[in-house]
Amino acid sequence: MGYTIAQKIIKEHLVCGEMVVGNDIGLKIDQTLTQDATGTMAYIEYEAMGIPRVKTEKSVAYIDHNTLQTGFENADDHRFIQSVCKKHGIYFSRPGNGICHQVHLERFGKPGKTLIGSDSHTPTGGGIGMLAIGAGGLDVAVAMGGGAYYITMPKMVRVNLTGKLSPWVSAKDIILAVLRVMSVKGGVGKIVEYGGEGVKTLTVPERATITNMGAELGATTSVFPSDETTREFLKAQGREEDYTELKADDDAVYDEVIEINLSELEPLAACPHSPDNVKPIKELEGQKIDQVCIGSCTNSSYLDLMRVAHILKGKKVADNVSLAIAPGSKQVFNMLALNGALGDMIAAGARILESACGPCIGMGQSPNSKGISLRTFNRNFEGRSGTADGQIYLVSPETAAVSAINGVFTDPRTLGAAAEIEMPEKFLINDNMVIEPASVEEMDSVEILRGPNIKSYPETSPLTESIEASCSLKVGDNITTDHIMPAGAKILPLRSNIPKISEHCFTVCDKEFPERAKTLGKSIIVGGENYGQGSSREHAALAPLFLGVKAVLVKSFARIHKSNLINAGILPLTFKDAADYDKIKLGDMLELPNVKSEIASGPDVTVVNKTTGDTIKADCELSDRTRAIIIAGGLLDYTKENS
């Protein structure tokens, strides 16, 4: 039996465990990336391990989230990250150089390599043939120190692409079509691998758009083959020596196969408030819109923005629409400026933003009250835009641009013939905003710069034999990490300060939660299906940890968040019988008698509702390793004990 692309990379990097679905496996990590909203905590964690210099082939820290410097906090954090990078062997991408995933694809990604990043959209690297996985900051810190990264061996899904996209239909429409089929939880425990003749018709940036939004499927990662198209992209980036051919064996076996005929696809939109709430644009056509935002790590490549510039050239943005455009990298921005495309955008009435995440994370450009905003981004969770009742639709750059001109939802196919936008034979290469680390000889003299906003990792303690705690919060299905730990311009600057940021934990769902949890001292959260979907932010585990949350009892978890809870020493419990969710109310006193002994011996955990007298059976699905992490009180304590 042959291997899939992902299985080949896993086999090459396997350091422990067997490649059997459901088994815990450890992987050697070649590259890491961080962004600044999660990076400060990752580097605080790395420092705590006491390892002088990173042991990866390449580690890069990007500044792309907290670029709105309305106070000292962000600038201080950036100085801290830059000094840590200088001292410990990490490359530093300065603010303005671009969004981490776009820049990493351009300048550092290598086919066949493993990459983990403290950002859930790290699978963007799958567009170039990497096994690229989003992870919590502590997992990234451990990998930088030379430790293995552990995952549950996933199932393999093949998405077989046939045909060719019609004019005005884009890669964004492909991944929206996949989301329509699989849903936001259909990829959990799976790697999505793209193959078929249709793959050859897609450029590397188009492939990266698709793997980027594999995160919205809940997938471990997504990956494309590395082929002649990959070689041409790397050659144009001056990195042809990084090319390696990578494809699935003809006799590779997949657990699931999805067929998509590219010729049959049409322009699509993900409607509020979920990326899998997908409808054809033709069903929305004519509805008035208020705002259009083009950019993000999903759709900010040179190819995307050249297509946008072509649509906007000689036109005017509708009076009722605000159009904002953020190029994904300095490389893209500079090339658009030199070839005149940037001028066409500005002349049409676009507001040009810096090369950063910006509106995608609620960092500026929030729409008006109940405003309808078309965005080329990857998430449209309620409130994520910064406007609580904003109506966010996820669309392609082509749909976004033509709708901005007309002021209403518009199918781009109404424009007629589409211009052929070619990939450049050579990209503009200027890495002067990537700062190299100090040499081994110089690193001891580098001083770490810490601002007053930077606080220590929250205190943890080993698992006790029994837990008795109140239910401090009860929430429903599809709770996102944006619900747990909101982002935006006011809260993101606090990411280095767990005590302060904890004051905002779950306030989207219940404004009283932080104070209630703090008063209780220790508590348990109860939730529904797919709890913790979305961003990889470990702050969604660290803030509850700081507030005394000992366990989270839900119907099911999203992958990264469950891992982050384990890393923080918080028990991730699931109902054996989902109907038992109704047996717990806010304020009920819950007891986990003998939980330490139960965890040590297997998955079964007993939960007694002392308020009602009900006994509830729960599962705590852990490997031998994660069981030891929970008992130790979290990954940091476990790592110290075993180093």
Locations of regions flagged by a protein language model:
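Fe-S-dependent hydro-lyases/dehydratases of central metabolism
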Residues: 1-643
